[in-house]
Amino acid sequence: MEGLETVGSALLTLGLVAVAVALSLYERLDLEKDIGIAVVRSFVQLAAVGYAIDYIFGLESLVAVVLLLAGMVGFAAWTSSRRARGVPRALPVAAGAIGVAAVATLGVLLLLGIVPATARYLIPLGGMVIGNAMNTASLTLARVRDDVTEQRLKVEAALALGATSRQAVSPILKTALRNAMIPLIDSTKTTGIIFLPGAMVGMIIAGADPLEAARLQIVVLYMLLGSVSIAAILVGLLSYRSFFTARHQLKVDLSKG
């Protein structure tokens, strides 16, 4: 690709990072360290995954692809659980939701013959699914935790009137699910008008036909809508139970599973 054939040419964009650091210093935002860590980590991680994917492409092994995707699910679940501190059993909940979303979404694409079972398709598409499911899981877990804590009296009042734990937190779950899914829905609505998505841009820059890029992007968008919906609903249904006892009583300490 002309202009991006070497690592050095990509590193020239560090000038833009310098602008961000300068603005942080000028406004005293105290974000210089975070920006520096983000830049270094992204470089190392992308370089490492680039070599790893290149190696897996050479193997042409479906087992290696599955193992890589499983590792991505595990790391995504760990990241999501860290963002949702205070939610009992957040790690297994996130892992289950993200894993099911990935398997279900990619499974449908494979069964319908939309994409071939090759590393070139499964790794990037799987990464998109897992990444978006991770963000959705994080948002849902955090929102359920915060709302159950803030609306404790309302939940206990509903329980006192004979509601089950599911009925008592139903409004909370609906709000959490809507807030987790709306960003992607809005993004999908404005695709092609306000911005061009990453997959389409990448293909066009790489020299692909714009119509072919548009077709793939449509697949990606619908795939992400499905995976995000699955992840959000599973996280909501699995997480709220950990705040209650077997007798449908709200736990005194919500952080304990």
Would you name each region that the model predicts?
Residues 30-69:
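Loop-to-helix transition at the N-terminal end of transmembrane alpha-helices
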Residues 143-180:
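Short cytoplasmic-facing helical segments at TM-TM junctions of multi-pass membrane proteins
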Residues 5, 9-13, 64, 68, ...:
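Loop-to-helix entry region at the N-terminal start of transmembrane alpha-helices
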Residues 37, 93, 170-186, 219, ...:
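Alpha-helical transmembrane segments of multi-pass membrane proteins
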Residues 192-220:
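Glycine-rich helix-loop "coupling/hinge" segments at transmembrane-helix boundaries
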Residues 21-33, 75-86:
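C-terminal ends of transmembrane helices
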Residues 210-240:
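Hydrophobic alpha-helical transmembrane segments of polytopic membrane proteins
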Residues 21-22, 50-55, 73-77, 103-111, ...:
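Alpha-helical transmembrane segments of multipass membrane proteins
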